[in-house]
Amino acid sequence: MQFRFLLLAEGWRDSVLGAPRRLLVTLGSLSRDSSPCPAAKEEALPSLPVPDLETTLQKYLAQVEAVAPNHLERTRSLVRAFLSGPGPKLQQRLLERRQKTTNWATEWWLNDMYLSCPLALPINSNPGLAAKPKRFANQQEAAVFLARFLTELLNYQELLDRHGLEVERMKSKDGKTMQSLCMAQHYQMFRIYRRPGVNSDEQIILDRASSGDHIIVAHHNQFYNVPVRASDRGRITENELTQQLLRIMETKADPRTPPVGILTTAKRPAWAKAREELVKSERNRHNLELLERCLCVICIDDDVLPTTFNNPIRKEDRWIGDRDYANVLHHALHGGGSRHLGANRWFDKTVHAILGKTEDF
């Protein structure tokens, strides 16, 4: 209760940076449109096929035999009853659904495997990876590197905005022809957000007009709004980005700052209830909206996970050369939890880039 009181009473500190005025007022409504983007429709893509019922049931029995052989005979009896009972009617409903949707399984898969799962996002859902080590002599070099990274990221975003990404293809089953792949996931990666819900999360897909003009930088568990486009002249320069990042890097930790990012590591219903309290404050509601609409989150960590974090794991199982990759991946996946760097994240946002104290990125 004390943490929540401090958060609601004090709100979040304003960014030390100036932002275009239009970012400081309520922007347009969030879109919940889950239809494929126009670029995904440029080439005719086949609808996801519905396997015939007998094939589906035979595959199901084969899996039961592999994982629960003691239940195989009982399952066979249930399968026979299903095949002679409601099975054909449900199969027909699937075939009808296929005629009305681009992919009949997407909505169910998304809700069942992800949005309805109450588990915390770190480890259970969110992936992570480690880039090649990049050593910096000082903060200036690190800021220049991050600014260059963001510049290239913005270039890629603009490529997506003009639908300029080449359609990917893979060999068809016959091994002779090439099948075009749906590119919707690429076009949504910067414009998608996972909002917590008590019963189920909500996937927010933003339109181009209301997102992508700013990034969020996390440092010392505090979140800064950094504009990447100005209302009067378009994209800011790489040097301007460097200077803004440097100013954030030079800020000192404030023990009074509530580690609000740790809420995104909680089980989803708990985070959803906490969010309901947060949005009662207009200031917190505005800041949450900025987080939802940002292009990405850049996490600048002034620490690393201690070498004892993975002490039970043998060194030969976690080191490659002079790098502890087990620790690096823990750093990327969850930041070590509340005792370490886990609050310097916002796990609901799709794209994170994490800069460690040493060479980790």
Name each region found by the language model.
Residues F361:
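Classical protein tyrosine phosphatase
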